[in-house]
Amino acid sequence: MSRAAETLSKIPLATLAIMALCVAVYGYQLLMDPPLQQFTMCPSEVIYLHQWYRVVTSSLFHGSLMHIAMNMMSTMAIGSSLERQIGTIMMALTISWGILLTSATYISISWLLFAVFGLEKMMLQHSVGFR
């Protein structure tokens, strides 16, 4: 068995699944070259245009090879350790809740900065990557 295969065989299921999904999405980005701004988190487009898919896609799309490489290395290290402690189901729920809550927080803070201080640019900003 190669080192890579041995390393992959030691990664727990939920961690491996989220890593595989992110790598597959990045592969799609490289092959199809979709306009990244169609998938990024943009609070105004989520709130006013009801593009709720951005809550999930913004966490799966990455801006560069370095971006995904660093995220996947940290996901492998931290996610594997955490998943061994809390189990696969809890890890999957933690990842899901993490995606939803970080997106909700980002949207809420952007809207609040717009509503209170008139910072419209916060509502129009696009972000990408597993936050």
Please annotate each region the language model reported:
Residues 3-127:
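N-terminal TM1-TM2 helical hairpin plus the immediately adjacent luminal interfacial "cap"
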